[in-house]
């Protein structure tokens, strides 16, 4: 298990984890296809996939309304939908199994969110968007004034908070998904070590997969919810 490593490719002096690139692409395609198929033939009496997607949208609408006024927050429903759905699918991809090259020991099929580079990039993207919409909605002057309100002494702490938000948002997702996959690999390794190991690891593996489903769903919710919390802090006056 310890010999497993990511497939790294160099391009223009930069290193790319090709497993993360592959699995991110697959997760995006799954989200796109489900959304496209579910909304291709909209009906006033929804059923099946359309009914499920409408439930997801209503759930996301509730997250936004809990954090900001809908007149302001309504524009972020597509962003929240994409974050929630993508993170959930990405978390689930490594749940049933992992695939690796037995010759090179490179892991190809896994949850892309078990890569800290991806989760921190997503977190940075969210934080940058909050600044963009904060300036767009409030105006540059009023937005900057928020950093010295109610007292200018808070300025350095609010700057530190921006970096802390990025770090915690990304590392929380990475840490939970990575721990889930590490324990799953341990159980699979034990299950393939022999007949006794197979029977001993079977039930814990099933239980942990069920718990992994719960972890993946909760982390997707937390990521989307915190994204809307950070957005509300920037676009609404306090």
Swiss-Prot record:
BP term (GO), one: proton motive force-driven plasma membrane ATP synthesis
Signal sequence bounds: none
Similarity annotation: Belongs to the ATPase A chain family.
Keyword RNA-binding among record annotations: no
InterPro entries in the cross-refs: ATP_syn_F0_a_bact/chloroplast, ATP_synth_F0_asu, ATP_synth_F0_asu_AS, F0_ATP_A_sf
This protein's record includes keyword Aminoacyl-tRNA synthetase: no
Keywords carried by this UniProt record: ATP synthesis, Cell membrane, CF(0), Hydrogen ion transport, Ion transport, Membrane, Transmembrane, Transmembrane helix, Transport
Compartments, record wording: Cell membrane
Single GO molecular function: proton-transporting ATP synthase activity, rotational mechanism
Membrane topology reported for the UniProt record: Multi-pass membrane protein
GO cellular component: plasma membrane; proton-transporting ATP synthase complex
Quaternary state and interactors: F-type ATPases have 2 components, CF(1) - the catalytic core - and CF(0) - the membrane proton channel. CF(1) has five subunits: alpha(3), beta(3), gamma(1), delta(1), epsilon(1). CF(0) has three main subunits: a(1), b(2) and c(9-12). The alpha and beta chains form an alternating ring which encloses part of the gamma chain. CF(1) is attached to CF(0) by a central stalk formed by the gamma and epsilon chains, while a peripheral stalk is formed by the delta and b chains.
Role noted for this protein: Key component of the proton channel; it plays a direct role in the translocation of protons across the membrane.
Species whose genome carries this gene: Alkalihalophilus pseudofirmus (strain ATCC BAA-2126 / JCM 17055 / OF4)
Cysteine-cysteine disulfides: none
Coiled-coil ranges per UniProt: none
Name of the protein in its database record: ATP synthase subunit a
Gene name per UniProt: atpB
Residues that span the membrane, as ranges: 18-38, 76-96, 117-137, 195-215, 216-236
């Amino acid at each position: 298990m310890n010999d497993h490593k990511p497939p790294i490719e160099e391009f223009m002096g930069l290193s790319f984890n090709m497993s993360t690139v592959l699995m991110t692409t697959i997760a995006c395609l799954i989200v796109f296809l489900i959304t496209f198929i579910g909304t291709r033939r909209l009906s006033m009496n929804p059923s099946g996939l359309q009914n499920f997607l409408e439930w997801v949208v209503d759930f996301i609408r509730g997250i936004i309304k809990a954090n900001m006024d809908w007149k302001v927050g309504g524009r972020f429903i597509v962003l929240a939908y994409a974050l929630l759905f993508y993170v959930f699918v990405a978390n689930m991809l490594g749940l049933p199994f992992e695939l690796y090259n037995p010759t090179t020991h490179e892991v190809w099929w896994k949850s892309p969110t078990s890569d800290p580079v991806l989760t921190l990039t997503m977190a940075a993207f969210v934080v940058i968007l909050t600044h963009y919409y904060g300036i767009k909605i409030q105006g540059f002057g009023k937005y900057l004034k928020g950093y010295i309100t109610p007292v200018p002494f808070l300025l350095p702490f609010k700057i530190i908070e921006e970096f802390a938000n990025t770090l915690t948002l990304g590392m929380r997702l990475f840490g939970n998904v990575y721990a889930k996959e590490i324990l799953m690999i341990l159980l699979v390794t034990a299950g393939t070590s022999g007949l006794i190991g197979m029977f001993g690891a079977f039930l814990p593996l099933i239980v942990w997969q069920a718990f992994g489903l719960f972890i993946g769903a909760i982390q997707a919710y937390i990521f989307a919810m915190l994204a809307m919390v950070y957005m509300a802090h920037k676009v609404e006056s306090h």
